[in-house]
A protein has these predicted regions:
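A general structural signal for stabilizing positions within well-ordered secondary structure
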Residues: 1, 35, 96-97, 157, ...
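Active-site beta->alpha loop and helix N-cap motifs at the rims of alpha/beta catalytic domains
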Residues: 3-12, 17-147
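C-terminal alpha-helical cap/extension of soluble enzyme domains
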Residues: 6, 11-16, 35, 39-41, ...
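Generic non-transmembrane alpha-helical segments
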Residues: 67, 71, 130, 182, ...
Length: 298
């Protein structure tokens, strides 16, 4: 069950592991990247939502991108989230990322001011024109306040050859299904990845290409097992892996912010990281961490 899509399988939006002073902990982050590779993850996204893109400056991101590309060394694909409300910052990080040798960029729709479809179209087209790299759209209306409709996605794909995919983080699989139906008319190889962890199977049934989701930080092996079982037609194993993922979804309910929950779970799995996230986001409490440990202990 393969396709000609450029991005297919299981992709991890990596946490950005930090020291207590807010600087990046490259030692533990490198170990985390190695773990993803050893598990068989198809690619990693730097500076997505879980990677706290909104709170880190372009210079720090560029340095981190160079580190990650060197660390990964071609063992999996490297994607970079270039999202920002300032288009100049988007273009600057896109240029730095392209120079570093990443495989693709991911651009979230402009947030805060709720752009019209025409504004969003101009924005994404400007991002695509600023790079020769493949660009993946990022639709997360719960956080951005605006939705990339199936029709808009199809228009962008048809008019910009290097817009080659979308991460559709919408808790309604019918939206993703409609995106697939619309965009495949203009680009049969367009990649459609779901942002919700438990949607891998229904995404694939609907004609999509997999997931780019947070729990891959915690148990990448489980997601890889699901993907490989699906590809080979081993549906008994696929169901078992999907059931585990369904159970792990309760981790998201343990903390005030999903980023804290994921960092806490990575720590509980054995990587001795600091679970700090950038203020003003709420930090993980001791009680929340104990709840995470309890969930993962079962």
């Amino acid at each position: 069950m393969t396709s000609n899509a450029m991005f297919e399988g299981v992709f991890c939006p990596s946490i950005t592991i930090m020291n207590a002073d807010g600087t990046i902990d490259y030692d533990n982050w490198g170990k985390h990247l190695d773990h993803l590779i050893d598990a068989g993850i198809d690619g990693v996204l730097l500076f997505g939502s879980i990677g706290e893109f909104y709170a880190i400056d372009v210079k720090t991101k560029a340095e981190a991108v160079r580190f990650a590309v060197s660390k990964v060394a071609g063992r999996m694909k490297v994607l970079v989230g270039v999202g920002d409300t300032n288009l100049d910052n988007v273009k600057a990080l896109a240029a730095e990322s392209e120079a570093a040798g990443v495989d693709a960029l991911l651009a979230v729709s402009p947030y805060y001011f709720g752009p019209s479809p025409d504004c969003a179209k101009r924005y994404f087209s400007a991002v695509a024109e600023a790079t020769t790299l493949p660009v993946i759209l990022y639709n997360f209306p719960a956080r951005t306040g605006n939705d990339l409709t199936p029709e808009l996605v199809a228009e962008l794909a048809g008019e910009n050859p290097n817009i080659v995919g979308i991460k559709d983080t919408v808790d309604t699989i019918s939206h993703t299904r409609k995106v697939i139906a619309a965009v495949r008319k203009v680009n049969p190889s367009f990649s459609v990845l779901s942002g919700f962890d438990e949607y891998y199977t229904v995404n694939r049934i609907s004609g999509g290409n997999g997931v780019l989701c947070g729990l891959t930080n915690v148990e990448p092996e489980t997601f890889v097992s699901l993907h490989r079982a699906w590809q080979s037609g081993d549906y008994a194993t696929a169901i078992k892996s999907a059931e585990r993922i369904s159970y792990l979804m309760r981790l998201y309910d343990t903390a005030d912010l999903f980023i804290s929950a994921i960092k806490g779970a990575v720590k509980a799995k054995g990587l001795p990281i600091d679970t700090s996230i950038h203020e003003p986001a709420v930090q993980l409490t001791d009680e929340q961490y104990r709840n995470i440990q309890s969930i993962l202990g079962k």
